[in-house]
Amino acid sequence: MFLLLNCIVAVSQNMGIGKNGDLPRPPLRNEFRYFQRMTTTSSVEGKQNLVIMGRKTWFSIPEKNRPLKDRINLVLSRELKEPPQGAHFLARSLDDALKLTERPELANKVDMIWIVGGSSVYKEAMNHLGHLKLFVTRIMQDFESDTFFSEIDLEKYKLLPEYPGVLSDVQEGKHIKYKFEVCEKDD
């Protein structure tokens, strides 16, 4: 079975994605709505999208917002023995998570797969063979960060000039400019 694999991430100019287990910048309402819309919207009636995240990302989400609603939540951890409270599934690696999607309890329920963090999960996905789309919000300034996104290899990934449902013009919120980009690889 072939499921679409996507990463969605917001990066500042220094490729920072986190600081002290939180965003390195103020939350941007329209960027958050974009994240929700992209990761929630299924193209197949009766199916849901699967969001895959690392343990630290899971626990960085405020408890009242866990699990991410209208999505199947899977946490990656080599330490946990069972899914954390609220999570639907647990896997030790991205490969194990992808194998889980072939099992009967998920095979007929999952439409798209969205990797939502953190940095090691993104890196594992970006090095995974096969088709992958990166939905990157480029925050057009630096923020002090302690967690970073890998540089995108433009030899491997092609920046798409446009993508349905993704605004291509510069956005602004809380005096922070940002733009949405979509990159794709197929190896």
Curated annotation (Swiss-Prot):
<keyword id="KW-0472">Membrane</keyword>
<dbReference type="GO" id="GO:0046452">
    <property type="term" value="P:dihydrofolate metabolic process"/>
</dbReference>
<dbReference type="GO" id="GO:0046655">
    <property type="term" value="P:folic acid metabolic process"/>
</dbReference>
<feature type="binding site">
    <location>
        <begin position="31"/>
        <end position="36"/>
    </location>
    <ligand>
        <name>substrate</name>
    </ligand>
</feature>
<dbReference type="GO" id="GO:0033560">
    <property type="term" value="F:folate reductase activity"/>
</dbReference>
<dbReference type="GO" id="GO:0003729">
    <property type="term" value="F:mRNA binding"/>
</dbReference>
<comment type="similarity">
    <text>Belongs to the dihydrofolate reductase family.</text>
</comment>
<protein>
    <recommendedName>
        <fullName>Dihydrofolate reductase 2, mitochondrial</fullName>
        <ecNumber>1.5.1.3</ecNumber>
    </recommendedName>
</protein>
<dbReference type="GO" id="GO:0046105">
    <property type="term" value="P:thymidine biosynthetic process"/>
</dbReference>
<dbReference type="GO" id="GO:0005759">
    <property type="term" value="C:mitochondrial matrix"/>
</dbReference>
<dbReference type="GO" id="GO:0050661">
    <property type="term" value="F:NADP binding"/>
</dbReference>
<feature type="binding site">
    <location>
        <position position="10"/>
    </location>
    <ligand>
        <name>NADP(+)</name>
    </ligand>
</feature>
<dbReference type="GO" id="GO:0005829">
    <property type="term" value="C:cytosol"/>
</dbReference>
<dbReference type="InterPro" id="IPR001796">
    <property type="entry name" value="DHFR_dom"/>
</dbReference>
<feature type="binding site">
    <location>
        <begin position="117"/>
        <end position="124"/>
    </location>
    <ligand>
        <name>NADP(+)</name>
    </ligand>
</feature>
<feature type="binding site">
    <location>
        <begin position="55"/>
        <end position="57"/>
    </location>
    <ligand>
        <name>NADP(+)</name>
    </ligand>
</feature>
<dbReference type="GO" id="GO:0004146">
    <property type="term" value="F:dihydrofolate reductase activity"/>
</dbReference>
<dbReference type="GO" id="GO:0006730">
    <property type="term" value="P:one-carbon metabolic process"/>
</dbReference>
<dbReference type="InterPro" id="IPR012259">
    <property type="entry name" value="DHFR"/>
</dbReference>
<dbReference type="Pfam" id="PF00186">
    <property type="entry name" value="DHFR_1"/>
</dbReference>
<feature type="binding site">
    <location>
        <position position="71"/>
    </location>
    <ligand>
        <name>substrate</name>
    </ligand>
</feature>
<dbReference type="GO" id="GO:0046654">
    <property type="term" value="P:tetrahydrofolate biosynthetic process"/>
</dbReference>
<comment type="pathway">
    <text>Cofactor biosynthesis; tetrahydrofolate biosynthesis; 5,6,7,8-tetrahydrofolate from 7,8-dihydrofolate: step 1/1.</text>
</comment>
<keyword id="KW-0999">Mitochondrion inner membrane</keyword>
<comment type="function">
    <text>Key enzyme in folate metabolism. Contributes to the de novo mitochondrial thymidylate biosynthesis pathway. Required to prevent uracil accumulation in mtDNA. Binds its own mRNA and that of DHFR.</text>
</comment>
<keyword id="KW-0554">One-carbon metabolism</keyword>
<feature type="domain" description="DHFR">
    <location>
        <begin position="4"/>
        <end position="185"/>
    </location>
</feature>
<dbReference type="GO" id="GO:0005739">
    <property type="term" value="C:mitochondrion"/>
</dbReference>
<feature type="binding site">
    <location>
        <begin position="16"/>
        <end position="22"/>
    </location>
    <ligand>
        <name>NADP(+)</name>
    </ligand>
</feature>
<dbReference type="GO" id="GO:0046653">
    <property type="term" value="P:tetrahydrofolate metabolic process"/>
</dbReference>
<keyword id="KW-0560">Oxidoreductase</keyword>
<dbReference type="GO" id="GO:0005743">
    <property type="term" value="C:mitochondrial inner membrane"/>
</dbReference>
<dbReference type="InterPro" id="IPR024072">
    <property type="entry name" value="DHFR-like_dom_sf"/>
</dbReference>
<feature type="binding site">
    <location>
        <begin position="77"/>
        <end position="79"/>
    </location>
    <ligand>
        <name>NADP(+)</name>
    </ligand>
</feature>
<keyword id="KW-0496">Mitochondrion</keyword>
<keyword id="KW-0521">NADP</keyword>
